[in-house]
């Protein structure tokens, strides 16, 4: 992890960001400082406790779209690539490759959840008005 991080005024000087409570804004900056080179934070709850915030502040950031939380406890700063540009010789891959695989980058360089990370059933099960053929395998129904 680097010792220097950047924050874009295109993100932190917007009305949406400035409407957040000051503690929530401070949490965003601290998460950005502790993120790895792909924007992932391994221990967000530790940061929340360290700076005197609450999980409510973290939930506000998530509801506002500034972070995405994963079931593993890791989170990613959605505007990471808007805020930070790294030279390729200094870049270190994140160790959270499973979580990174669930994301895609939007045209505006923001992380968003990709569609393949949200489909839990095959497409054929998604369409409720069509049924697959039913075949009976009972011994008496087999023709000889």
Question: Which residues does each predicted region cover?
Answer:
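Basic side chains
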Residues: 4-5, 34, 81, 90-92
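Charged low-complexity intrinsically disordered patches
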Residues: 85-144
């Amino acid at each position: 992890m680097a010792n220097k991080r950047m924050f874009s005024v295109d993100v932190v000087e917007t009305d949406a960001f400035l409407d957040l409570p000051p503690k929530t804004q401070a949490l965003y900056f601290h998460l950005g400082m502790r993120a790895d080179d792909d924007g992932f934070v391994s221990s967000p709850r530790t940061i929340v406790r360290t700076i005197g915030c609450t999980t409510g502040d973290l939930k506000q950031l998530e509801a506002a779209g500034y972070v995405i939380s994963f079931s593993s406890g890791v989170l990613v700063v959605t505007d990471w690539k808007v805020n930070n540009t790294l030279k390729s010789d200094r870049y270190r891959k994140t160790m959270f490759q499973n979580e990174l695989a669930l994301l895609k980058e939007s045209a505006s360089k923001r992380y968003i959840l990709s569609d393949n990370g949200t489909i839990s059933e095959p497409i054929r099960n998604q369409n409720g008005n069509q049924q697959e053929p039913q075949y009976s395998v009972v011994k008496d129904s087999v023709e000889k």
